[in-house]
């Protein structure tokens, strides 16, 4: 995996928090950029997992392998809004492809539909989202608060989201690989 130059920031890129962001929801976060334009940016944090039970009446997930469904904190904005990231191309007419084989959106009813669904489909239910005003993310890059990395279905739906931050930095190599070993609590160093 190679680091993407800042100029390549676009839908489908990963924002990887610099160790300089310490504390708060963005500390050691990996954000999937879902939209980026001069007017602003919108993304979903992928590695802040929420341990909650899903009420069957709200989330009809009976046709999904439970190990393939995760709940996460998508960001600090509108935490009562749920964003759906998934790998089901069958719902592509009501979804937007963010990167190859990863879709955003769709009606929750598609999750309960058995037809066309495979038990290999993966889903992230993200509570809230992350947003930046026009120029804000660019300013944060200049302050070296974020690194840019390419995304893939494998990274987004990893079986080890708690290691996503260090794994992505490790794959970027070079100085990024050494940053991946910095302990969360520097007093433990």
From Swiss-Prot:
<dbReference type="InterPro" id="IPR003774">
    <property type="entry name" value="AlgH-like"/>
</dbReference>
<dbReference type="GO" id="GO:0005829">
    <property type="term" value="C:cytosol"/>
</dbReference>
<dbReference type="Pfam" id="PF02622">
    <property type="entry name" value="DUF179"/>
</dbReference>
<comment type="similarity">
    <text>Belongs to the UPF0301 (AlgH) family.</text>
</comment>
<protein>
    <recommendedName>
        <fullName>UPF0301 protein CT_211</fullName>
    </recommendedName>
</protein>
């Amino acid at each position: 995996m190679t680091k993407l130059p800042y100029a390549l920031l676009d839908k489908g890129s990963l924002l990887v928090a610099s160790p300089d962001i310490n504390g708060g929801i963005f500390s050691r976060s990996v954000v999937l950029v879902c939209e980026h334009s001069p007017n602003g940016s919108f993304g979903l944090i992928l590695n802040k997992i929420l341990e909650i039970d899903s009420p069957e009446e709200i989330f009809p997930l009976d046709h999904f392998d439970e190990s393939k469904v995760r709940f996460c904190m998508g960001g600090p904005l509108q935490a009562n809004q749920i964003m759906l990231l998934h790998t089901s191309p069958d719902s592509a007419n009501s979804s937007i492809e963010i990167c190859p084989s990863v879709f955003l959106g769709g009606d929750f009813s598609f999750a309960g539909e058995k037809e066309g669904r495979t038990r290999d489909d993966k889903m992230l239910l993200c509570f809230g989202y992350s947003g930046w005003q026009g120029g804000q993310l660019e300013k944060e890059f200049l302050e070296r608060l974020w690194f840019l990395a390419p995304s893939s279905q494998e990274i987004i739906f990893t079986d080890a989201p708690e290691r996503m931050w260090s794994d992505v930095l490790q794959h970027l190599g070079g100085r990024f690989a050494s940053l991946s070993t910095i302990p969360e609590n520097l007093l433990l160093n």
